[in-house]
Curated annotation (Swiss-Prot):
NCBIfam families per record: PRK06676.1
SMART domains according to UniProt: S1 (SM00316)
Transmembrane segments: none
Domain S1 motif residues, every copy: 18-85, 103-168, 189-257, 274-343
Disulfide linkage: none
Gene source species: Bacillus cereus (strain ATCC 10987 / NRS 248)
Family: Belongs to the bacterial ribosomal protein bS1 family.
Positions of post-translational Phosphoserine modification: 244
CDD domains cross-referenced by the UniProt entry: S1_RPS1_repeat_ec1_hs1, S1_RPS1_repeat_ec2_hs2, S1_RPS1_repeat_ec3
UniProt protein name: Small ribosomal subunit protein bS1 homolog
Keyword list, A-Z: Phosphoprotein, Repeat, Ribonucleoprotein, Ribosomal protein, RNA-binding
GO biological process, one term: translation
Domain of life of the source: Bacteria
Amino acid sequence: MVEKMNEEVMDSKELQVGDVVTGSVTKVEEKQVLVNVGYKTDGVIPISELANVHIEKASDVVELDQILELKIIKLEENDLVLSKRAVDAEKAWIELQEKFTSGHVFDVTVKDIVNGGLVVDLGVRGFIPASLVEVHYVEDFTDYKGKTLAVKIVELDREKNRVILSHKAVVELELDSKKKEAISSLKEGDVVEGTVQRLTDFGAFVNVGGVDGLVHISQISHERVEQPSEVLEQGQKVKVKVLSVDADTQRISLSIKAAQPGPWENIAGEVKAGDIREGIVKRLVTFGAFVEILPGVEGLVHVSQIANRHVKNPNEVLEMGQEVKVKVLEVHVAEKRISLSIKEAFEENNVTEDYSQYEPNADSATFQLSDIIGEQLKKLKK
């Protein structure tokens, strides 16, 4: 059949360089292939004319009895040289232009690893730059040889014989699609499990269902957090509550503390008026001091409740981080408000010091309890 087809071509005109003929592979050698095209002698396809990418041996591309479309690149009396890659390239450019125009995604097999990226055979040489292989950094591409990748054409220039492909672009499209799907499945108020992906100074990014949401530092714990890395680590599983979802900007706000019982939920059974407790001074303000008596639970010691003597400014006798004893005066769970007193705790516990040394005698000036408390607070501050 091949001979008949080519006989018809040769009957109508003499074979010329540039003609396209059909041939059957009669012999596959290491560096060339012999093909019967109905000419008086078998044509030869040099290994360099088999493909548009580097190949080690001819058998990597063709096999015995395979039917090929070939272009005549040299024709002399007993010398017929043919090219498979020239025909492949002509067809390839037409197909590649269609794929480039439509943004079509298609599979390719990596033929070679070169400096700067990957080489594929598309009928013409295609190149995937290292920066366009994956969304993440790849140090060694050795394992990519022979691998099949989904790609799209990002640059096409026939005059320069330039075909640039991207696998990264396909991965990003898939990730974006999954992200939109994940976002659409999340609703404000949902409590879901996530994985800590990244930690920053302002919070933590947590992956929930394939999409990252931000847990602001203020939403990590009911207790004050200076650095997210103090309480969280990458890869940690956490329960989060969805605070808000913005499908347009693809932003998700999450809260770890909102997914946990609040420190005030069981406060009624733990703290009651009259209790004497140890606490830590967390904040000093002009009207008093906020003292933490349980993790995440602070009460106010009004400036009038710091000592029996007049205290103009709380920082005169107290400092941040200082440990103090306080008496619970009032507990208002609904308002999350607790009133505390340092001076009453001193009075009730009698400061645990022997104050007999301060008792006045006939020859000494009198002392007031306010002086004693003020002196003790100053000692604690030191």
